[in-house]
């Protein structure tokens, strides 16, 4: 099985990374894909949003898995992976992960510890989605070193130019030095309030500024109070409000991501002839 590893990254917090990771993951599962979600944020937002309100009480989290790799200790198959009723698996995170980030600074092959862990799981999943922490620290670098694709959620309420440039520069550095397979799938506009001209202007400006170099997804995720309610419920927007506009947005994004994969496969097949 050719596993697609997608990092959901933006060093700014509050842009919809966790929501996108959970709902795109569950959207892919509904489309028949075998999906693992990785929470690589010590705050454990993805872990909490998928029904684990106390990540610190979980017996095994990502920091334990990465610790085993660091210490060259064996991992049992699927150890610590939780199953969510909507058809995805989850490797949870807790605050111990911030200690792991400190340990990585002096470790050998420090940028590839997460990649080495994911290599033990690759054949079991068609898709692995990584929810990155809101920083460009060692955990995010590990996620980018492990991924072959990046999706960048951007909130449509402000112009993200400076932060976006930093992220793009980090992605190109990781691609150049560590992971030549890394590609940007696109920029995803989130929390879009189409009632305001400002949101439309930001969207137009993003497409104008980056559209020639980087795809800006045709799908935009609308702003919704209902979407904000679900993080306490432990379920996706598809289970919470299946006919709402946010569920429709994530359904469309899922189709766009699958279409992109098919296009890439086609062009790879064409090149290899």
Where are these regions (language model features)?
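P-loop NTP-binding core
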Residues: 1-273
